[in-house]
Amino acid sequence: MKKQLSFPQGFWWGAASSGPQTEGQFDKAHENVMDYWFRTAPEAFFNGVGPDVASDFYHTYPEDFRLMKEIGFNSFRTSIQWSRLIKDFETGEADPKAVEFYNAVIEEAKKNDIELVLNLHHFDLPVELLQQYGGWESKHVVDLFVKFAKTAFEYFGDKIHYWTTFNEPMVIPEAGYLYAFHYPNLKGKGKEAVQVIYNLNLASAKVIQLYHSLGLDGEIGIILNLTPAYPRSDAPEDLAASQFTDDFFNRVFLNPAVKGTFPETLVKRLEEDGVLWSHTEEELQLIRENTVDFLGVNYYHPKRVQAQSNPEEYKTPWMPDQYFKEYEWPERRMNPYRGWEIFPKAIYDIAMIVKEEYGNIPWFISENGMGVENEGRFIGENGVIDDVYRIEFYEEHLTWLHKAIEEGSNCFGYHTWTAFDCWSWNNAYKNRYGFISVDLETQKRTIKSSGRWYRNVSNNNGFEVEVEE
């Protein structure tokens, strides 16, 4: 028997992307950290493919918006590149070519009846600010980010209703300072990572304060990657590992963003360990008073944790790993290409946490996706990639999201990652995520089976599922 799962009126159907992963480096005055990393170490990138052209959104955006409309998008998120928009980082002076480009993108979205969400930071710190000031370890960089935001709001604030400060800010300390998978590729820098976490929270609050002070008729939020930390067992030591992991990787951004305060248990632990961030009472007050209007949640996979069997190994230098250790759940279902567990129920668990512990703030799924390698082998006789695995992935996640909405979750949209295949940092184009395939040699776009499926979902504001009678 089939049942129609219908979503709330006005529900967002669309996808997310970012400037550094799609635009290419055309007409940019500055390099971001990813541009620099590729230029200095191209061998670190899959097949030696960098961000110089990427998906060529800088030139193809009119076609891309037309295709997005064709597959049912009513909304789309991308980002403004700090290294593109700003000519002089110290003054916040804009580059006229960048202003012209982003205005054209905004106009094209409007022409196609697509609500454009603009994000201000997607792992793309200008490399000069890392080299001169130490990047996000520096509060001067926080202030320069506010100047960048001010310029963006002055040029585009009256044209864009939905803004976000950061995409997945936790990835910056995690990838750049703790585990070395994004530039500057540092490892074991726990104390520095803790300061970066604080400074990013401060930067977000300062930009929110600025936005509201300008009297703009819109809303501003943040995009967080929430990865529920499921304990291996109900043993006290596993539960403690789960709580620490949740505090350190999720709530250290979620709490300040929505409640204006940091998790007390985490602050106490960091203080006891002598690694608490440098802060002032004035800064904490500013964070308290400038919370988000809405929340975006990126969900890909859960964390599964247990007590750390060898905590001493992670105490000098300080690392969060002394309090938890990941483990492989025997019943896990994996995406073998990306190495991530597929666990759709977590999207429901996140929704219930936001509802019950965070005032049921308006929120949306801002990314959810499945990256698959060598998708060319799934091309059918019609020349279309028949990505039924992606359709099944989305249907499972949407079914759990629908259940959460039925139970009162204030979720207003579902964005996938991503609209068209894009450059994924040092994985480049290894795993493809899009509804629309991109031929890197010709930049030709072709809608996949999942794109046609998504059009039907959007047109019907829902989809049918099989249920037992």
Which residues fall in each region the model found?
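Active-site-adjacent substrate/metal-binding segments within catalytic domains
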Residues: 23-102
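Active-site region of glycoside hydrolase catalytic domains
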Residues: 2-45, 89-90, 99-469
